[in-house]
Amino acid sequence: MKTFDKEAALELLDKDEELLSILIDSFLNETKFEKTVLEKLIAQGKTKEAASYVHATKGAARQLCMEKLQSSGQALEDVLRGKSGGDIPSLIEKMFSDYEEALLEIQKA
C-alpha cells in the first residue's frame, strides 16, 4: 500500500498536472487533521461529528491516491459509525501516523 501514488492520482485527473498541484496545495494548506480535535469530539460523545471529521480527511486522501491514509481513515470511520468493531485510540494513532507520513511524502511531489 502506497503513501502517495502520484501516477495514479494523475490518471484520475486525466494527466492534469495543474489540477494535481491545486489539490496538493489544498491538502497541505486546507485539510488539517488534528488528533486533539478528533479526540475532543470523541470525548464529548460526538461520534457522528468525529466520523465526519475523519471522512473529510479520508476523502481528500482518496482524491490524491494516498492509499495508507485512505485505508486507516476508512477503518476508523467504520468504527465511529458503528459499522465494525475496533480499538478507537489505536485507530486514531494509525490514521494520524499515516497522515503525517502523507504530508511528508506529498511535499516531495
For each feature predicted by the language model, list its residue ranges.
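Short helix-adjacent coil turns
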Residues: K15, L38, I42-E49, L64, ...
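DHp/HisKA histidine-phosphotransfer helix
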Residues: K46, Y53, L91
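A local structural micro-motif
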Residues: E49-A50, L69
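An anion-binding catalytic pocket shared by soluble metabolic enzymes
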Residues: T57
